From Swiss-Prot:
One of its GO terms (molecular function) is ATP binding. The gene is miaA. Monomer. The record marks 105, 127 as: Interaction with substrate tRNA. Residues 39-42, 163-167 are annotated as: Interaction with substrate tRNA. Belongs to the IPP transferase family. It catalyses: adenosine(37) in tRNA + dimethylallyl diphosphate = N(6)-dimethylallyladenosine(37) in tRNA + diphosphate. This is tRNA dimethylallyltransferase. The keyword Magnesium applies.
Amino acid sequence: MGIDRRPLAIAVMGPTASGKTATAIALAKQLDGEIVSVDSALVYRHLDIGSAKPDAAERAQAPHHLLDLRDPWQTYSAAEFAADAGRVVADIVARGKTPILAGGTGLYFRALLQGLSPMPEADPVMREALSTEAAERGWAALHAELAKVDPAAAARIHATDPQRIQRALEVYRLTGTPISEWQRRPGVAPLPVRTLKLILAPRDRAVLHQRIEARFDAMLAQGFLDEVRALRAMPEMAAVTAPLDLPAVRAVGYRQAWEYLDGEGDAARFRDKAIFATRQLAKRQLTWLRGELDARWFDPHVDGERLAGAVSTFVAR
């Protein structure tokens, strides 16, 4: 087998609250690299505290890319991300640096490392119709409908993942072709890099749950609710007829905060709902990550030396 001469990239993957930001910064310093965010919440301006977006001190330690690309009332597709990330990675490589792809959005990672099928663009009218149906029937009913027209997609998409249910049904209703079929068609090519996939996750699930809870309490102390109040006060957000359908507001924590500020439940109930939703997100992320068969798993708080050794070995190849 010949030598793989493609440029090197490091993918730092993992569930929420697993330590990806700190690890990515450490690797960027070790490899003279630059960090490319692979996170669907971090593309939105004004979503800082609740998204755990790297702060000014963290950004000062290494260059960061693909943060703050859109306003919260706008949308941003996986195809747009793949195009933007492709340009950024090409520029990083051209300057002799190492791209550090860091985040927890599985669709974005698949778009980068496996390519993206040429699916139709989002249709606001269809999305609004699906949201109205969900309000009347519930997302579980729409998931059951998806299972009838696209069993393969329904098997991959959890019944509590409204954004992906909506997208799958949107594509089917617009084209008459299941999204699983679209995903098999050639489209955007994967990045022309050789990639070391690192998955960060505590060995003990209870430890991850504790970190999620502690981090959310820290976000509350930092002013997360005030951040959401400021979002709600923006004229552009106030003009949106169904703000809970916006991808930015659907982000874990933001949706629960929005509902709380709408008068749903008390502060304790809001906290419990947000922490539960974050744990469910972590569960879905771990399910996706277990399918990454060519990845290396590490507990960043235990396996620091082993992780550094794996990176050094890969780079030296």
